[in-house]
Structures are given as C-alpha cells and as structure tokens.
C-alpha cells in the first residue's frame, strides 16, 4: 500500500463543515465593504522578491526570516528571477496600481481577499498559509478616511457579534523625519541599557529599533517605561492629523486607547497606526491592524500618493467569532430537499427541481440521489439542514402534484406542481 501524502505543515485543509462557517463570515465582511463603495482587486500570489524587500523593509522579520522565496528561469532566458509567495497584500496592491495607472491623480478604494504565506512556527491562529482581507485607499490624506476605515471595521464587529470582545489601540508614528529623530533618541537610550536587553532586542537596536517597543519580554517592557516617548517627537502636521482622527472617532462613539508603543512590524507605515486586539485568543491578540503609508507608492516607483489601509487574518477572526459568539452558525447547506420514491419518479423529480431553481433563484435545493426509502431520504434532508422537503411519489407524479412538508413544524400540504414554487416562496419568507 502506498504511503499517504499529508498536507504541508502549517498549511491547512478546511473541510465543508468549516468552510460553511467561513462563507458566512466572508459574506458579512464583503457586504459591509461593498456598502462603503470599495472595489475588489485581485493580484497574483507570486511577486518578484525585490517588491517585498523594498516595501516591507530588508531588516524586518518578514523579509529576513519568513518569506517563501525561490529562483525561477524562463525556458529561453538566461537570467534567473527571484520570486516570492506574497507574505502580505499591500505591496502587490500598490505594484498593480502603479503598473496599470490606477493611482495617477486618482482616488482609489480597493479591497482584496486571498491566501498569504509566511514561514513561521505554526500555532493556533498563526499558520504558514493564511487568508487575509485587506482594504487600501489611495489619493486621500485627511484623518477622515483613516476614521472611516476604522468605522468600517467597527461595523464588522457589530455584524459578527464580537464588538464587546475587541478593543482599539491607536498611535501616530509621525513623518519619516520625525521618526528618524525619535529613532536616534531611542537608540541612544537603548545603548545606555544594553545589558538589560535580550539578544533579539540587541540585534534590532541598530537594524529596526522601533521594533524593540513591542518586545514581549517583561524586563524589556519595564525598561521601556523610562524610554523617550514617541509622541514627544511628532511633527506638528502629524499631531494635528492624529488629533483630528481622535475627534472623529469620539464623534462616532468608537472607544480607543492611545498606545505609544504601537509601531507595527512593517517599515512602510507613517502617521496613523492602529490595531484591534482581543483577550479571547490567548497570545494571538491582534485581530486587525493597519495604518497610513504615504511614502510607499513613490518608494515603489510611482508618483507620491497618500495611502492608508489595513489587513485582517480570517483564520484568527473565525476563531474569535466561534469563541465568543456560540450562536453564530453556518448557513444551512440546503433550504429544500426533494424526496423521490422509486426510480420511475426520478425523471419527474429532476425536472421539477430544475423548474424550481429557475423560479426560486438564490434558494438552495438538493435532489435525492442513490435511492433509499422515505425514512433514509428524510434523514438526508435533516443532515443537510433543509427546512422543507418536497415529496414526489408515484401517485403525485400521476396526478401532477407534490407534497410540501415543513420539516420544523411537521405540517405538510399537497400542492399542484405548477404552484409549488409560489407555495415554497411563502414558506421561506
């Protein structure tokens, strides 16, 4: 017997019982996004490696440790090209916008959803292949669009029933110049206390010192209580931008906490950064995160363009929804199950099923196949979550009727086949 081949570590299969829950979550997410006027963009999962090095930063953990990268060669070409499975969605979205002229003096509001890849240690809520939804806005620089993105996410939480289990953390990391000044002050402070830093922080101190601020080491966190505050180094425009954002959120009734150690892990951010966090998923507390990246388009070869966006991991979101909202169930696979007794009734049953699909668009109808007595067929209807059974026996076929049975109340009615669709429409509401 041949050896079974298993899935790659950290890359999961999602079986029908799981994908049904995912699909309901995704429907809610998409409905909210589209209600705000965003348009979907789809980009490749493979990009040239320099895109991520330039966008994310060469000394970030993502680029240094976590990317799936390989060399590729066209059949007739001598040049080897380095390609990478996308670890995040913003860089590819910006690349596509520049390449196709979407960002030239234009406002764009885009969203995307799909798999991303990072070579991390797999654990609950963090996998090597994971799925993200992201929103990106180009061409708008005021705090009002930052606020709208946060309001949109707050609407998600309400629709998913998790509002009481997520909290918003905000910060401003200022302009590139202000952040450079703060970086120098932070490095000077860390050098004075180098003996108190762990090896990871010592490495980051010179390569990416702002990442020391979100160290999980309790001793480092205690040391940082005396470190220079990022807020003291903000330029005036960034202060005004952040104050405007806070005022808009307060007007919308969205509570937040200012966290001056919130910096995000990617180099392209400036000014606004934010995270929605939860205490309901253990150590994996971040549910959704993003911020402003006004310099990235120019950095990747386009014209200077204001930009802001965020991304959310769907695995973590589904875990949270299921953990805190037990009433959240997958939509039924089937609304109506068509029961047919005997092979002689099957042609009529299948013809009726097709007619009902024509007359009831959007209704999920499954026809019984494989025979079986009525008891077995009603058992299958229950397994698929059907609310209603339409029953065709030999007598119904002969006289042009069908029995419509409400599987919740047990009530059933004989209906002319030409009237079955109207009767079902009434029952389904």
UniProtKB/Swiss-Prot annotation:
SUPFAM superfamilies membership: Class II aaRS ABD-related, Class II aaRS and biotin synthetases
EC number, as in UniProt: 6.1.1.21
Pfam families according to UniProt: HGTP_anticodon (PF03129), tRNA-synt_His (PF13393)
Classification via PROSITE patterns: AA_TRNA_LIGASE_II
Compartment(s): Cytoplasm
One GO BP: histidyl-tRNA aminoacylation
GO MF, any single term: histidine-tRNA ligase activity
Catalysed transformations (reactions): tRNA(His) + L-histidine + ATP = L-histidyl-tRNA(His) + AMP + diphosphate + H(+)
Quaternary context: Homodimer.
Protein family: Belongs to the class-II aminoacyl-tRNA synthetase family.
Protein name, UniProt field: Histidine--tRNA ligase
Record organism: Escherichia fergusonii (strain ATCC 35469 / DSM 13698 / CCUG 18766 / IAM 14443 / JCM 21226 / LMG 7866 / NBRC 102419 / NCTC 12128 / CDC 0568-73)
Gene name of the encoded protein: hisS
């Amino acid at each position: 017997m041949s050896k079974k081949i298993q899935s790659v570590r950290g890359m999961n299969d999602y079986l029908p019982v799981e994908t049904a829950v995912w699909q309901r979550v995704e429907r809610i997410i998409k409905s909210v996004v589209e209600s705000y006027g965003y348009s979907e963009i789809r980009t490749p999962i493979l990009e040239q490696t320099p895109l991520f090095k330039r966008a994310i930063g060469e000394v970030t953990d993502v680029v240094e440790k976590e990317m799936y990268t390989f060399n590729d060669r066209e059949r007739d070409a001598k040049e080897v090209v380095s390609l990478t499975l996308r670890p995040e969605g913003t860089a590819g979205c910006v690349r596509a916008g520049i390449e196709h002229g979407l960002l030239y003096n234009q406002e764009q509001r885009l969203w995307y959803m799909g798999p991303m890849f990072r070579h991390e240690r797999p654990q609950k809520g963090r996998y090597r292949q994971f799925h993200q939804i992201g929103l990106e806005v180009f061409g708008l620089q005021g705090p009002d669009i930052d606020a709208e993105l946060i309001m949109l996410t707050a609407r998600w939480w309400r629709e998913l029933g998790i509002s009481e289990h997520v909290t918003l953390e905000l910060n401003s990391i200022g302009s590139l110049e202000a952040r450079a000044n703060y970086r120098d002050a932070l490095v000077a402070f860390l050098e004075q206390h180098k003996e108190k830093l762990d090896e990871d922080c010592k490495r980051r101190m010179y390569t990416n010192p702002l990442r020391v601020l979100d160290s999980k080491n309790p001793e480092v966190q205690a040391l940082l209580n005396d470190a220079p505050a990022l807020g003291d180094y903000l330029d005036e425009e960034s202060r005004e931008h952040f104050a405007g954002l806070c005022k808009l959120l307060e007007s919308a009734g969205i509570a937040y906490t200012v966290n001056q150690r919130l910096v995000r892990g990617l180099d392209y951010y400036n000014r606004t950064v934010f995270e929605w966090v939860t205490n309901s998923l253990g150590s994996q507390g971040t549910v959704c995160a993003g911020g402003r990246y006004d310099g990235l388009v120019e950095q990747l070869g386009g014209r200077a363009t204001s930009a802001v966006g965020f991304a959310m991991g769907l695995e973590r979101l589904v875990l949270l929804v299921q953990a805190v909202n037990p009433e959240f169930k997958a939509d039924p696979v089937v609304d109506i199950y068509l029961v047919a007794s005997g092979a002689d009734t099957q042609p009529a049953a299948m013809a009726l099923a097709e007619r009902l699909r024509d007359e009831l668009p959007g209704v999920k109808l499954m026809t019984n196949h494989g025979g079986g007595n009525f008891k077995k067929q009603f058992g299958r209807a229950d397994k698929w979550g059907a609310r209603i059974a339409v029953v065709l026996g030999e007598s119904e076929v002969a006289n042009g009727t069908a029995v419509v049975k409400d599987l919740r109340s047990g009530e059933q009615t004989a209906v002319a086949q030409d009237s079955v669709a109207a009767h079902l429409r009434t029952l389904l509401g």
